[in-house]
Amino acid sequence: MIPLRSKVTTVGRNAAGARALWRATGTKENEFGKPIVAIVNSYTQFVPGHVHLKNVGDIVADAVRKAGGVPKEFNTIAVDDGIAMGHGGMLYSLPSREIIADSVEYMVNAHTADAMVCISNCDKITPGMLNAAMRLNIPVVFVSGGPMEAGKAVVVDGVAHAPTDLITAISASASDAVDDAGLAAVEASACPTCGSCSGMFTANSMNCLTEALGLSLPGNGSTLATHAARRALFEKAGETVVELCRRYYGEEDESVLPRGIATKKAFENAMALDMAMGGSTNTILHILAAAQEGEVDFDLADIDELSKNVPCLSKVAPNSDYHMEDVHRAGGIPALLGELNRGGLLNKDVHSVHSNDLEGWLDDWDIRSGKTTEVATELFHAAPGGIRTTEAFSTENRWDELDTDAAKGCIRDVEHAYTADGGLVVLRGNISPDGAVIKSAGIEEELWNFTGPARVVESQEEAVSVILTKTIQAGEVLVVRYEGPSGGPGMQEMLHPTAFLKGSGLGKKCALITDGRFSGGSSGLSIGHVSPEAAHGGVIGLIENGDIVSIDVHNRKLEVQVSDEELQRRRDAMNASEKPWQPVNRNRVVTKALRAYAKMATSADKGAVRQVD
């Protein structure tokens, strides 16, 4: 038997002071000696994906208590990337991932909690908690707040926007064809309920990946935040984590720990899922970071290999009119994993917090398996309510029938894949010797080869300016540098530049490359995570206006057509300059907190984690 971590504060004479304090929190005499389960919540009124989580912790706590554990809740911070987008607030988004991970470690280790239920949802909160879980390696179950419903259709100047979401609103704001009244109509429809934004953006991508990693329950990534069916996920999470405690502490079963579940094979399965569902490019950052925290030998080269073999089986907003509610109707993540499994594209030697093997997991939960349980079938009938609300569990609507069309439906089989390559591709070349990433699911294949002159800017703000003032021309490659983890600092998302290119009619006529990153809502020929970044001496810092940049997605190449000799001449000049590898004319306030992150941050190919050794 493995002693409970909390025993040092709950058992023996030396723990009298700690027990006195535990009693002051409401702990009962008969609870001392039981596993203390940290309910790691992230409720906030700042973020629609978290606004409904205030009372959810109580649901989990009740389930933990009934199962024999002692629940204790605390909260982490949560940044809304959409509200922080396009101004200095975005500098804080990626660094907040590290703050969240650290805060979870601080609370859990300071109070010797035995296990965790992580109630996350939005962009950096799930990754931050995932990093903490892999770092701490104690029993954990993830249960997110769930996706937002898609907005209802609106018609603006005869053009249908159906259904709507956050990206619809941002793109419409940059379109000359949309007047103020039309923009107001789109805005009012775009985000109708609580939950993580309704497309396959970063938040939903990461919540889906926790299913594939084996750390959350089936349906976690796709069951709507507003649906009553989601209550059972919270209850089951509380029950399950106590069972994991029993197996680890009582039976010394280390296979139930995060590092026993999220093995290299599980990480490979998660990235195979990511490729198949056309997930956000941010997932690569976060998966690489989580692997490092868990000491899993999984890097960008592994992702590159997977992307060559795994087809894209689903295109969801911003790459189609499908949204998470449609993914759910098609069977959610178990259906996607089922198609990958039938295609021989998954490692079978994996398990999860809820199942001892992959085959049993998919038999029970994949609606196309022919063996699906009634519970699973009922779950995937959960449909949107269509009513504006910030309340969880506010609808019990059901789809009349499920989407099982493997040829033309939301989730396709391997035979009917959108593309043979995965929805995410790693590009290398003299601009990105350590790698860059493109969401190939977001662009038509005829755009996979693009060559044009560079238009160089040194901040996201400058990029927005050249787009909105119509300075950039069709056929050009917009190069946005010094926006990497160190150079930004904070590796801003380029959602506004990509949305404004789309709204200006240049979404298919220009390319954008950056050492920054992209929102999960970005689309078009957008290449991010260029490594090394400019601030670390990357070639992206040497590109000049007019240099010819070539992009070849098929052959995974990203090159600037400048000789090695000329690049070396430019490098020598840069090194001899007064402020080498820094933006020349950028006016940006960088606080001490951000400077601290910048000094420790690695480039994107390492997950933009902090290097502290």
Swiss-Prot record:
Annotated residues for binding of Mg(2+): 81, 123-124, 493
Keywords (A to Z) from UniProt: 2Fe-2S, Amino-acid biosynthesis, Branched-chain amino acid biosynthesis, Iron, Iron-sulfur, Lyase, Magnesium, Metal-binding
PROSITE patterns: ILVD_EDD_1, ILVD_EDD_2
Modified residues (N6-carboxylysine): 124
Reactions the enzyme catalyzes: (2R)-2,3-dihydroxy-3-methylbutanoate = 3-methyl-2-oxobutanoate + H2O; (2R,3R)-2,3-dihydroxy-3-methylpentanoate = (S)-3-methyl-2-oxopentanoate + H2O
GO cellular component: cytosol
E.C. no: 4.2.1.9
Active-site residues from the entry: 519
Pathway membership, UniProt: Amino-acid biosynthesis; L-isoleucine biosynthesis; L-isoleucine from 2-oxobutanoate: step 3/4; Amino-acid biosynthesis; L-valine biosynthesis; L-valine from pyruvate: step 3/4
HAMAP family: IlvD
Protein name per its UniProtKB record: Dihydroxy-acid dehydratase
Organism from which the protein derives: Corynebacterium glutamicum (strain ATCC 13032 / DSM 20300 / JCM 1318 / BCRC 11384 / CCUG 27702 / LMG 3730 / NBRC 12168 / NCIMB 10025 / NRRL B-2784 / 534)
